[in-house]
C-alpha cells in the first residue's frame, strides 16, 4: 500500500494522458475512462497542484460512475488527499468506502496508514507548538532580565 501512496507517475505517462484528455475535451466529450486515467496520473504527480487537479476530476466523476467505478474514484480521492496531507478528507473517503465494503483490505490498510500519518504529524505539530512556547517563554524571561538590570 505504501508503494501506491508513494508511486510517482512518469512525465511521459502524464503527458500522454493529458494529451488524450485535452483532445477529447476539444472534441466536446471526455469519456469517463479518459478522465479517470488522467486523474489517476495527476494524483500520482509530485506536484501538489497536479494532485489537486486530479482530485477535482475524480470528484466530477463520482456521481457519474457505476458502483465499481465509484469504488476506484473514492479510493484515489483518499490517496490524493493523503498525498496532500489532507488526512481528515482522506479518512472521510476511505471510511465511506469501508462502510460499503467493510472487507476491503486495501481500504483497511489505507485507513491504518492515514491514522499513522495523522499521529506522526500530530506529534510533530505538538512538538513545534511546544518548542515555540518555550521560545516565547525564554524570550520573555530575557526581556524581564534586561528590564530589571536596566532599573538597577
Swiss-Prot record:
List Phosphoserine occurrences by residue.
10
Carrying N-acetylmethionine, the residues are 1
Predominant subcellular localization, coarse grouping: mitochondrion
According to the UniProt topology, which residue ranges lie Cytoplasmic? Answer: 1-122
GO BP of this protein: cellular response to glucose stimulus; cellular response to lipid; cellular response to peptide; cellular response to toxic substance; mitochondrial fission; mitochondrial fragmentation involved in apoptotic process; mitochondrion organization; negative regulation of ATP metabolic process
Q: Which residues lie on this side of the membrane: Mitochondrial intermembrane?
A: 144-152
Per the record, what is the consequence of mutating residue 98 to A? Loss of mitochondrial fission-stimulating activity
| Ubl conjugation listed as a keyword | yes
Report the function annotation for this chain.
Involved in the fragmentation of the mitochondrial network and its perinuclear clustering. Plays a minor role in the recruitment and association of the fission mediator dynamin-related protein 1 (DNM1L) to the mitochondrial surface and mitochondrial fission. May not be essential for the assembly of functional fission complexes and the subsequent membrane scission event. Also mediates peroxisomal fission. May act when the products of fission are directed toward mitochondrial homeostasis, mitophagy, or apoptosis.
PANTHER family, sorted? MITOCHONDRIAL FISSION 1 PROTEIN (PTHR13247:SF0), TETRATRICOPEPTIDE REPEAT PROTEIN 11 TPR REPEAT PROTEIN 11 (PTHR13247)
Q: Which family does it belong to?
A: Belongs to the FIS1 family.
Q: What is known of its domains?
A: The C-terminus is required for mitochondrial or peroxisomal localization, while the N-terminus is necessary for mitochondrial or peroxisomal fission, localization and regulation of the interaction with DNM1L.
What is the recorded name of this protein? Mitochondrial fission 1 protein
Q: Which organism is it from?
A: Rattus norvegicus
- Which gene underlies this protein? Fis1
